[in-house]
């Protein structure tokens, strides 16, 4: 967006590095065992995935953990790469719903309704009571990307209108 937003992003990244170093942690050991098993071997690989999920919109602001979003558009949120902590941070920032993609199936419910989206049909089949949407149907050739996208969009609207997610049905929120 502008130089100020760029500087906030740089400060956020360097702040994480400084935090890891100050606690004698190796910065580049960040990808979890699950990430590594899925093919993500470096912090750079993991970061590229985050950037891709953001799309091509310009970053409008960088906000601290627990700080609400005040700027329209794409915002970067300061927080660790931990599923539970990240979903809580999103909710604290003002998210009314969390769309959580997973290739391994983290079983949790966040403070806001959390749609868990399986990236593969094997996971969706194994964890039917955890997974709300199977995006693996695209890779399987059962649905086109546009068809699956339309299905997910309808599900998001349904949940926004009161339909419970799998976690909510089990009382986790």
Protein language model features and the residues they cover:
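Anaerobic metallocofactor- and corrinoid-dependent redox/one-carbon enzyme cores
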Residues: 1-173
């Amino acid at each position: 967006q502008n130089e100020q937003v760029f500087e906030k992003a740089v400060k956020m990244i360097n702040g994480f590095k400084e935090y890891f170093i100050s606690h004698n942690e190796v910065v580049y050991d960040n990808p979890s065992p699950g990430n590594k098993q899925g093919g993500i071997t470096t912090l750079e690989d993991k970061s590229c995935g985050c950037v891709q999920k953001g799309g091509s919109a310009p970053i409008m602001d960088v906000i601290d953990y627990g700080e609400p979003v005040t700027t329209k558009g794409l915002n970067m949120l300061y927080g660790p790469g931990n599923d539970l902590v990240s979903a809580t941070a999103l909710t604290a920032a003002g998210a009314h719903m969390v769309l959580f993609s997973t290739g391994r199936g983290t079983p949790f419910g966040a403070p806001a309704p959390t749609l868990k989206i399986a990236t593969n049909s094997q996971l969706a089949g194994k964890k039917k009571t955890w997974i709300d949407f199977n995006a693996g149907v695209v890779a399987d050739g059962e649905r086109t990307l546009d068809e699956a996208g339309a299905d997910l969009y309808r599900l998001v609207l349904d949940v926004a209108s009161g339909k419970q997610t799998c976690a909510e049905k089990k009382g986790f929120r």
